[in-house]
């Protein structure tokens, strides 16, 4: 048995296509939209199309930005240290660093990591664009350090190594963010791999 | 810190307005749409507007139906017993009964329950429309029984009592669905109120 409305069925189907949205949730969302004014549906519909029509990748850092704002606000900002580039996998990771408010350099978004098993090679992510950025002759744009901030997965590590080998011959300092005990975490609840990394990465006091 | 794209921020805001969708989930859904082809966004956008433009309430049973299908398929069906009407709170509850495949009568959807604390009175839900249905003089449409299938809440019980008092003087049999132990449930895990109800509602074997 399905709903007595084809329009309702279709909207439930479309909601259920979204990741992490099951049929029960899709049904609840659809019923919610039924009870909302038409303007609510219009706003969500417009936002969906706008994201497809207006969002592009910044020609500098490959971060997401609006069509009428390229390079992105971060790349255009006069308050950023242009000698450091932090390399991240996704715009969400970039946002995580920005939220800390501590990092003041530039970014480069790879939009993925090298993953041979998934058929993703260096040319499928934004490695070439990174290389172009750090190779520019203009003195004012000289990048001195690239900080790799990829996820601690096998693919992330592989990608970090690959990029590091490309950049070092260019005389650029390449670093990697520290792995260790999260702030506020209790040692007894930390997994062994993290503990080992924390021990390896110990620093003098 | 927000995204470097206004279009992305707007879509996250709109997703986060949906019930049960937090900001993290909204962010994930937005990133998903960014990676989908434009047709995926178009389909969801169209489905949202269609639900507002095409869905109406059946003039007979108040169930949701499409504009070009009134009365709804259930009310038009020749295979239903027109002497019984099952009264439910919402289209979702109607669907739950239809899924069982056992009930073959008609329905009436109240679209809510009487709730004085929320300022919802009998005229704010579809009680008047139910009264009109059972009061029709045509012999062929004569309703003999109304089954109240509202949720076992204070408001549901109040509404059941209210409707029952309206219908009984009209010579219509009014019944209420049984409360009791769910099929397959183990007694030890059933709450006391349900156990008491099950005991009260015991039937001869
Ligand atoms: Zn940028
Ligand atoms: Zn109907």
Swiss-Prot record, chains A, B:
<keyword id="KW-0863">Zinc-finger</keyword>
<dbReference type="GO" id="GO:0003677">
    <property type="term" value="F:DNA binding"/>
</dbReference>
<dbReference type="Pfam" id="PF21175">
    <property type="entry name" value="RecR_C"/>
</dbReference>
<feature type="zinc finger region" description="C4-type">
    <location>
        <begin position="58"/>
        <end position="75"/>
    </location>
</feature>
<dbReference type="InterPro" id="IPR034137">
    <property type="entry name" value="TOPRIM_RecR"/>
</dbReference>
<comment type="function">
    <text>May play a role in DNA repair. It seems to be involved in an RecBC-independent recombinational process of DNA repair. It may act with RecF and RecO.</text>
</comment>
<dbReference type="InterPro" id="IPR000093">
    <property type="entry name" value="DNA_Rcmb_RecR"/>
</dbReference>
<comment type="similarity">
    <text>Belongs to the RecR family.</text>
</comment>
<keyword id="KW-0233">DNA recombination</keyword>
<dbReference type="GO" id="GO:0008270">
    <property type="term" value="F:zinc ion binding"/>
</dbReference>
<dbReference type="GO" id="GO:0006281">
    <property type="term" value="P:DNA repair"/>
</dbReference>
<dbReference type="Pfam" id="PF13662">
    <property type="entry name" value="Toprim_4"/>
</dbReference>
<dbReference type="InterPro" id="IPR006171">
    <property type="entry name" value="TOPRIM_dom"/>
</dbReference>
<dbReference type="Pfam" id="PF21176">
    <property type="entry name" value="RecR_HhH"/>
</dbReference>
<dbReference type="InterPro" id="IPR023627">
    <property type="entry name" value="Rcmb_RecR"/>
</dbReference>
<keyword id="KW-0862">Zinc</keyword>
<protein>
    <recommendedName>
        <fullName>Recombination protein RecR</fullName>
    </recommendedName>
</protein>
<keyword id="KW-0234">DNA repair</keyword>
<keyword id="KW-0479">Metal-binding</keyword>
<feature type="domain" description="Toprim">
    <location>
        <begin position="83"/>
        <end position="182"/>
    </location>
</feature>
<keyword id="KW-0227">DNA damage</keyword>
<dbReference type="GO" id="GO:0006310">
    <property type="term" value="P:DNA recombination"/>
</dbReference>
